[in-house]
Swiss-Prot record:
Gene designation per UniProt: ywqA
Positions bound to ATP: D475, D476, M477, G478, L479, G480, K481, T482
Disruption phenotype: No visible phenotype in presence or absence of DNA damaging agents H(2)O(2) or methyl methanesulfonate (MMS); a double ywqA deletion-pcrA depletion strain has 8-fold reduced cell viability.
Organism: Bacillus subtilis (strain 168)
Sequence motif DEAQ box, location on chain: 576-579
EC number(s) stated in the UniProt entry for this protein: 3.6.4.-
The Helicase ATP-binding domain, residue ranges: 462-625
Span of domain Helicase C-terminal: 753-907
Pfam families, per the entry: DUF3670, Helicase_C, SNF2-rel_dom
Family: Belongs to the SNF2/RAD54 helicase family.
Keywords: ATP-binding, Helicase, Hydrolase, Nucleotide-binding
GO molecular function: ATP binding; chromatin binding; DNA binding; helicase activity; hydrolase activity; nucleosome array spacer activity
Name of the featured protein: Putative ATP-dependent helicase/translocase YwqA
Example GO biological process: positive regulation of transcription by RNA polymerase II
Length: 922
């Protein structure tokens, strides 16, 4: 390789004291980094011969960063390759002379800490004779500090100095002169055979004076001798008496009230406090050995803890409640000592800093006392609520504790420790562990059997009721939330605690279902439906329902009839599908959250569908104020969780809501063990006003026409009417043969209910089969579901070829889409669709065997999950009446009822009873 004849280097100092170096060849072209290392750093030790250089090249120019010592070594030692001709830029030439001087001083070990700079609060290095000045002196100081890391012995010595004499960097303390400074920090050797230290002794009796003793420690043996004047010195030490005098002078200059006539001095309690908390630390920084009482470390690091000793509610009631005010007394604790409020006030009045109480020294901090008094005044003004205790206790149980508890606990009791009574401690243990809950027997009036997890749910609801807390039963769809509530209602009534009715607010589509479930499982309960144009209003409202056990109403009426509903303090207010109040700002949500009830219960398989504020709305109904204001909740949880996915905040929120939210899924082991492999559930739904009007008109017109018909014509008319009534029950557009209608769900309560079911199913990421007899209905459902959920929905019907059907089935089984609509005839037999674990029969087939065959598309060999079957039945219509007949003749169904033809054999009177719309239809 051809050697370079000439290299031009340019060195420039940066603001932080480091330097940059760039180099150019004879053609004034930037020297490549590899060439720069070879020709300039070949003998440069501190960069390990160019290995540890930081590249700070900028556009078009190669440059490296050098520390102060690296630059001194490079320029002052001339570490360049001897085969290179190195030239300097005009700006760099002055640096060569300075670097050479600095290098020579450092190489000779001619440097030491600068005492004058230290006294002004600055640490610097200087040469022994103080020759260097200006820029060279500044560079010298930086270079020495940098050089220390490259010299093992020097680095070890410097670390020892900083550890033994922190004053060198804290600038605390006092030294008599430069020699005292260098000797004190250990830069130069102290020739005396001993070191001088101080020991603080506490008084024998509280209030007496404290004592400081001077002692001498033998450098060789480590033995201690207490100094009692020059006469007490060993003969071999007497030559160093001036060392003791200088130390006494230094102690006095550092702590003006600290002076010695001999080796002992007495100080006041106030001076003892200053010595313990401030002066001793300054002296230690100066390298003085200080011996303090063994208890001081603990007392120094401790603060007095303000405690609220909580008994129970003011009247000692077992019924607590989220907003109940609790009785408490103040206690003050520190170092294992607990003081009453009176004892604490007596201490504060004494204006002392150190007090010996029951053999223990206690620190009294005036600033801390002021802070505690402010806390006490605020807490007493606002009162202690059960919600304050619960939030704190639940947060304390979270792994990792509460580093930012101020953001979580915003009550007046933030920073105050709770000392709970045994009663409250037991209650919180039951809330958090949800174990050992009081056992209640299922009422003999309950006409059914609760599975173990359902009985637990009833006990859990009753436990929260007895404790005064609202509850959210959030079990998976199909696990029996309704019957757990019914068992709860019966127990409350039979325990003699029911003075007013229970109120159930539910979507219109499930009011009929509640009526039937209550009638089936609790026929002894008096159930009233507050619905329809003839419902009681005004002053008649309360009297009308005073003898009812349960009143049912809809979400829509909860706002329309808010005045009437608010006039009663209900025994229980139960919200079914409680996510209906998720928007806290709607009139409906606000109206419901203002209703008064002894116990508030929310039922919801999806208590939070999209936003955390939905959860807040439900909890504000259940336990008002527990999660704070909506604004505060948004700041503490919504923003950190939804914006930043803050795992700690998620954990905190889970801790807060867990005691009041019970959720079991079909995948839970204790639930799965008690579930049948298949659950068939009937969903009872009313007709919309449009459906009811069309239904009644069709029945009237048909019976008017039927009187003139006989035989086959009569049978044909009945079958025609039957089919058209089923279409009306499905959707008015199906009966009216409307094409591409946009207003779908609002005209059919059954379709609204389908949307509710599908929302819950998709929230669990589960799959579903939907069976219908009508192609147009299937197309309507497909259109609506795709628009609602934004995902493809397939429809398997008779218009598809075999290959198309096979492809649909194969993709569904591979879970490429979660929802499959099937026409009953095309998809009811012969298919294996075990990817689904929900089956919805949107309209009924009068032969149960046909429905069962359709259900068995999912419930068959290969199905590894629990299968939930939903049969949708419009109340008061032909669908419900035939369902009742089928149930009552179940034994004969498979043998006799194989088609709809049996209906045509009924008498006209029987047909009128069967087809006429009942009062429960709307």
């Amino acid at each position: 390789m051809a050697s370079l004849k000439e290299i031009l280097i340019h060195v420039e100092q940066m603001e932080d004291g480091s330097f940059t170096l760039s180099a150019f060849d004879e053609n004034e072209q930037p020297l490549p980094y590899s060439h720069m290392k070879k020709h300039l750093f070949q003998w440069h030790e501190s960069s390990f011969y160019g290995t540890f250089l930081e590249d700070v090249s900028f556009i078009g120019t190669t440059a490296v960063l050098l520390s102060p010592w690296m630059t001194v070594e490079l320029l002052g030692k001339n570490s360049f390759n001897s085969f290179s001709s190195v030239q300097l830029t005009e700006e760099t030439e002055p640096l060569i002379e300075a670097a050479s001087t600095i290098y020579e001083f450092i190489a000779d070990g001619d440097f030491m800490p600068d005492y004058d700079a230290w006294t002004n609060g600055v640490f610097r290095w200087k040469d022994r004779d103080n020759i260097l000045e200006g820029f060279t002196a500044e560079w010298f100081s930086a270079a020495v500090q940098d050089y220390i890391q490259y010299d093992d012995d020097l680095r070890e010595k410097w670390e020892h100095i900083k550890e033994k004499s922190p004053a060198v960097t804290t600038f605390r303390g006092h030294f008599l002169d430069e020699e005292d400074f260098l000797e004190g920090i250990g830069w130069i050797d102290d020739q005396s055979p001993f070191t001088v230290g101080l020991r603080l002794n506490e008084p024998d009796f509280d209030g007496d004076e404290w004592k400081i003793e001077m002692f001498l420690r033998d450098k060789k043996s480590g033995a201690v001798e207490f100094f009692d004047g020059l006469k007490s010195l060993k003969k071999s030490w007497q030559a160093y008496s001036d060392k003791i005098a200088r130390e006494q002078d230094r102690f006095h200059r550092t702590v003006p009230w600290l002076s010695f006539d001999s080796g002992t001095t007495l100080i006041s309690e106030e001076e003892a406090w200053i010595f313990l908390s401030e002066a001793s630390e300054t002296l230690v920084d100066m390298g003085v050995e200080i011996l303090l009482p063994s208890w001081w470390q603990i007392v120094r690091d401790s603060n007095m803890m303000l405690k609220a000793k909580v008994s129970s509610s003011p009247r000692g009631e077992s019924f607590v409640g989220m907003n109940a005010l609790l009785d408490f007394n103040w206690r003050f604790a520190t170092n294992g000592i607990e003081l009453t409020e009176a004892e604490f006030n007596e201490l504060v009045a004494s204006n002392r800093r150190l007090v010996n109480i029951r053999g223990q020294w206690v620190k009294i901090d005036p600033q801390f006392i002021k802070q505690m008094k402010r806390l006490m005044e605020k807490a007493e003004s606002e009162g202690l609520h059960m919600s304050d205790i619960l939030a704190r206790e639940l947060m304390d149980q979270q792994d990792g504790g509460l580093e930012d508890s101020d953001l979580i606990d915003t009550s007046a009791f933030a920073g105050i420790q709770f000392d709970l009574s045994k009663q409250l401690r037991s209650l919180i243990r039951k809330l958090t562990a949800a174990e050992n809950l009081p056992e209640h027997k299922v009422s003999p009036s309950f006409k059914g059997t609760l599975r173990p997890y359902q009985k637990y749910g009833m006990n859990w609801l009753l436990f929260l009721r007895e404790s005064g807390f609202g509850a959210c039963l959030a079990d998976d769809m199909g696990l029996g939330k309704t019957i757990q509530m019914i068992a709860y209602f019966l127990h409350v009534k039979e325990s003699g605690r029911q003075k007013t009715p229970h109120l159930i607010i539910a979507p219109t589509s499930v009011l009929g279902n509640w009526q039937r479930e209550l009638q089936t499982f609790a026929p002894d309960l008096s159930v009233a439906l507050h619905y329809g144009p003839r419902r009681p209003k005004g002053d008649d409202f309360a009297a009308h329902y005073e003898n009812a056990d349960v009143v049912l109403t809809s979400y829509g009426l909860s706002h329309a009839d808010t005045e009437e509903l608010s006039s009663v303090t209900w025994n229980t207010i139960c919200l079914d599908e409680a996510q209906n109040i998720k928007n806290a700002h709607t009139k409906q949500s606000r109206a419901i959250r203002k209703l008064k009830g002894l116990h508030h219960i929310a039922l919801s398989g999806t208590p939070m569908e999209n936003r955390l504020t939905e959860l807040w709305s439900i909890f504000d109904f259940m336990n008002k104020g527990y999660l704070g204001s909506l604004t505060g909740f948004h700041k503490r949880y919504v923003l950190p969780i939804e914006k930043d996915r803050d795992e700690k905040r998620i954990g905190q929120l889970q801790q807060l809501i867990r005691p009041f939210l019970l959720r079991r899924t079909k995948r839970d082991e204790e639930v799965a063990l008690n579930l049948p492999e298949k659950l068939e559930e009937k969903e009872f739904i009313p007709l919309s006003a449009e459906q009811a009007s069309l239904y009644e008109q069709l029945v009237k017109d048909t019976f008017d026409h039927m009187t003139s018909l006989t035989g086959m014509q009569r049978k044909a008319l009945i079958l025609s009417m039957l089919g058209r009534l089923k279409q009306i029950c499905d959707h008015p557009a199906l009966y009216l043969k409307e094409e591409q209608t946009e207003l779908l769900a609002g005209r059919s309560v059954k379709l609204e209910k389908l949307l509710e079911l599908m929302t819950a199913i998709r929230a669990q990421n589960e799959s579903c089969l939907i069976f219908t007899q009508y192609i147009q209905m299937g197309n309507m459902m497909k259109r609506l579901l795709e628009k609602t959920f934004g995902e493809p929905v397939q429809f398997l019907n008779g218009s598809l070829s075999k290959q198309e059907r096979d492809t649909l089935v194969e993709k569904f089984q591979r879970k490429e889409y979660p929802t499959l609509i099937l026409s009953l005839k095309a998809g009811g037999t012969g298919l294996n669709l075990t990817a689904a674990n929900h089956v919805i029969h949107y309209d009924r087939w009068w032969n149960p065997a046909v429905e069962n065959q359709a259900t068995d598309r999912a419930y068959r060999i290969g199905q590894e999950r629990f299968v939930h079957v939903h049969k949708m039945i419009t109340t008061g219509t032909i669908e419900e009446k035939i369902d009742v007949m089928l149930e009552s003749k179940q034994t004969l169904n498979d043998q006799i009822i194989q088609s709809e033809n049996w209906i045509t054999e009924l008498s006209t009177q029987e047909l009128e009873e069967l087809f006429t719309l009942s009062a429960t239809a709307q």
